A protein has these predicted regions:
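N-terminal pre-domain/capping segments
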Residues: 1-69, 75-97, 285-300
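Acidic/histidine-rich catalytic cores of soluble enzymes
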Residues: 128-232
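Short, electropositive alpha-helical surface patch
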Residues: 81-94, 119-132, 159-168, 195-200, ...
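Conserved, mostly hydrophobic/aromatic
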Residues: 22, 70, 88, 99, ...
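Active-site beta-loop-alpha junctions enriched in small/polar residues
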Residues: 6-10, 35-37, 72-74, 112-114, ...
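A short, acidic, flexible beta-alpha connecting loop/helix-capping segment that sits on the rim
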Residues: 10, 258-275, 300
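Active-site acidic/histidine proton-transfer and metal-coordination neighborhood
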Residues: 58, 77-176
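Acidic (Asp/Glu)-rich catalytic clusters
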Residues: 19-26, 46-68, 94-103, 134-139, ...
Length: 300
């Protein structure tokens, strides 16, 4: 099973620190942002410690294509404001070039919200934006991996058919999909009671062959709520059994599965505890840990 989590590449260790954090969770894949997801500051390529990072990946048998990049979620490729849309396009072009520089293959992108536009017009803007990004990065083996969204507000791409339209309109091997379990559940796909039905819809519209990454998250919300609130594995409305089923599904065996579940806090709200080591162990074993929360807090 390929399974890992979001990790940090901040501080002096940079990419080396990201690999070390992933290893501390017994992960064999991981996801990073090139910088803080809420701003545009990025450190120079020369400071990222790329040679050491690549050596560490080889040493621990982590394939470089299983290092996933996530673009900042503040960018919006769907909007009508041309200046803001162009800013998002230009920023993602830089992110794609940085992704290529570190040897990664997949960058996950939130497609965007249509805001004042209709959904159909928002999709037109996304298609236009993605074509511009591809045109500006020829020859780079980096795949733009569009995330399935929950449909919060005016978010696009909460329905598989919307992603199908984008894929068919652009018709490029560099446009693929990131399947998010929380988002799809919140948008109305019933993984719990209609697992094979969801798989069938996925395959008939997007095509399983077009999935490149899976975000494995439980959901704090009810089916079809269109709210997007992640929960720890087994602590939400999707539940451990269904999420483990996805992780162990042979149809997804080749795909990196990335946890984006929330950190836990102590009673003061100040100290935080990453849940990933315990959640990864639980999913690998395919056995629910009744003491999950205590084990996370006590790092057992």
């Amino acid at each position: 099973m390929k399974i890992g989590s979001h990790v940090s590449n901040a501080g002096d260790l940079m990419l080396v620190g990201a690999v070390q954090e992933a290893l501390s969770y017994d992960a064999n894949c991981f996801m990073i942002y090139h910088g803080a997801p809420q701003n545009s500051y990025r450190k120079p390529i020369e400071q990222l410690r790329i040679p050491e990072y690549k050596e560490l990946l080889v040493k621990h048998n982590i394939k470089i294509e299983d290092v996933i990049i996530h673009a900042p979620y503040i960018l919006n490729l769907a909007q009508s404001d041309e200046e803001k849309r162009q800013y998002a396009v230009d920023f993602i072009i830089r992110e794609v070039k940085m992704t290529a520089a570190i040897g990664a293959k997949y960058i996950v992108i939130h497609p965007g919200s249509s805001l004042s536009l209709s959904l159909a017009d928002g999709l037109v803007q996304i298609i236009k934006s993605l074509k511009e990004i591809l045109a500006a990065t020829p020859g780079l083996d980096v795949v733009l991996t569009l995330e399935t969204m929950a449909g919060k507000g005016t978010e696009t791409c909460f329905d598989f058919s919307q992603l199908k339209k984008i894929i068919e309109e652009i018709h490029s091997p560099r446009i693929k999909v990131c399947l998010d379990t929380c988002h799809t559940f919140d948008s109305g796909y019933d993984w719990v009671n209609d697992y094979e039905g969801v798989i069938e819809k996925l395959d008939k519209t997007i095509g399983i062959q077009n999935i490149r990454v899976i975000h494995v998250n439980d959901s704090q919300n009810t089916l079809g709520s269109r709210k997007d609130r992640h929960a720890n594995i087994g602590q939400g409305n999707i539940g451990f059994v269904t999420l483990a089923k996805i992780c162990h599904d042979e149809r997804f065996a080749h795909l990196p599965k990335i946890l984006e579940t929330p950190y836990l806090h102590d009673e003061s709200g100040k100290k935080v505890y990453p849940p990933y080591k315990q959640e990864i162990a639980m999913l690998k074993a395919n056995v629910y840990n009744e003491n999950l929360i205590d084990d996370i807090i006590n790092n057992r």
